[in-house]
């Protein structure tokens, strides 16, 4: 048995090959993440007598090139959580941190955990694209939130409270009524310098041009509030430029978010489990693809507990002797993006309260018992994942083999 420990970094890796009882087959050496170096590594591993297993840490995206290419070469590859490697065999007072030492430590981990190593599965291209899109979607959502807060902060100095005038959702192109309104009426003087009738006519024409619903009572309300507001920044070309730039940045982020949302739904619709997932309560055209992106192929989970462990919503245990803690926090060692999506699904269930849904019934029961918010939300996410696992796995098993 040969343990190949690979300490992965960006563009290069350190490799060490060991056998039981500390026998060094190959001292740590460096390889580049190029086709020639990876091919040479495959030939070296195949030339070593006996079964070989490769272990590396799944850090960021760095490891994926090696893991993918070595798996395609029919080698046993296992990608391990970096925390497990870090906590392994810390029985020395001396702290040594180098790529060579890390590769040897990973090889020793492979020997110690030989029987428990799980083989790395190459994700198919469609799921990989969907997951990448979801990560981009989350990134641009954060950008959109930052741009929105930035615009509101500027408008508070020219037209305080204008962002609260309309609550209509974003359109398919990402545009929002309050943003478009603030782009046109960027300063309170843009409204109150006109007469009431003139503003109503102007606002009505604006609604018609932008294809928004017009309400005369709303126009009168806006005009009345404008009379009482006190701006800080003057109504001049510099202030207008600042606001226009902030609006353009927000609209750009919003457009990207909505285009990604649409593309993710189109991509997810090609997955076999799409109809089952989309039929679940609390899941729609936005959250459904996000769930499928983060969970991936359900068949890789051996049981229901494995999928809740993966999400980090599994209940913790703290027992010692006669002591048994009643309420233990969840591990939160899994995918934070998946937990966020699950909480959004739970939030939809609470707002829509479908009485025939078992997850909502469970959440409602926990709320009635007086459980704290995070307790019943996490418990609901756990139950939702178990149902998700059961329904999807049953459906996939019923499909004819391709």
PLM features: residue spans?
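A detector of single, family-specific signature residues
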Residues: 1-402
């Amino acid at each position: 048995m040969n343990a190949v420990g690979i300490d992965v970094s960006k563009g290069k890796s350190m490799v060490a090959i060991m056998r039981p009882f500390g026998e060094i087959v190959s001292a740590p050496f460096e390889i580049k993440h190029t086709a020639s170096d990876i091919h040479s590594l495959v030939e070296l591993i195949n030339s070593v007598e006996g079964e070989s297993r490769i272990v590396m840490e799944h850090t960021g995206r760095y490891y994926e090139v090696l893991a993918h290419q070595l798996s395609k070469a029919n080698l046993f590859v296992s990608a391990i959580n970096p925390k497990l490697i870090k906590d392994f065999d810390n029985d020395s007072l001396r702290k040594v941190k180098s790529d060579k030492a890390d590769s040897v430590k990973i090889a020793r981990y492979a020997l110690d955990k030989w029987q428990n190593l799980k083989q790395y599965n190459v994700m198919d291209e469609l799921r990989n694209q969907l997951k990448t899109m979801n990560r981009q979607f989350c990134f641009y959502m954060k950008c959109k939130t930052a741009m929105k807060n930035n615009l509101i902060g500027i408008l508070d100095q020219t037209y305080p409270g204008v962002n609260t005038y309309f609550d209509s959702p974003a359109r398919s192109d990402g545009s929002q009524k309050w943003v478009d309104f603030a782009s046109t009426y960027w300063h309170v003087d843009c409204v109150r310098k006109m007469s009431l009738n003139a503003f109503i006519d102007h606002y009505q024409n604006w609604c018609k041009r932008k294809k928004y619903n017009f309400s005369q009572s709303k126009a009168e309300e806006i005009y009345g509030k404008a009379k009482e507001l006190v701006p800080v920044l003057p109504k001049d070309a510099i202030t207008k430029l600042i606001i226009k730039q902030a609006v353009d940045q927000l609209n750009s982020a919003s457009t990207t978010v909505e285009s990604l949302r649409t593309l993710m739904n189109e991509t997810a619709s090609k997955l076999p489990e799409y109809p089952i997932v989309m039929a679940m309560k609390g899941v729609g055209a936005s959250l459904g693809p996000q769930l499928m992106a983060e969970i991936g192929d359900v068949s890789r989970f051996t049981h229901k507990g494995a999928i809740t462990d993966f999400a980090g919503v599994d209940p913790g245990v703290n027992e010692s002797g006669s002591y048994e803690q009643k309420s233990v926090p969840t591990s939160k060692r899994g995918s934070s993006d998946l937990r966020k999506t699950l909480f959004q699904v739970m939030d939809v269930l609470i707002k829509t309260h479908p009485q025939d849904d078992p997850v909502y019934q469970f959440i409602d029961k926990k709320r009635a018992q007086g459980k704290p918010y995070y307790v019943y939300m996490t418990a609901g996410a756990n139950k939702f994942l178990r149902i998700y696992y059961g329904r999807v796995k049953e459906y996939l098993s019923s499909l004819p083999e391709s």
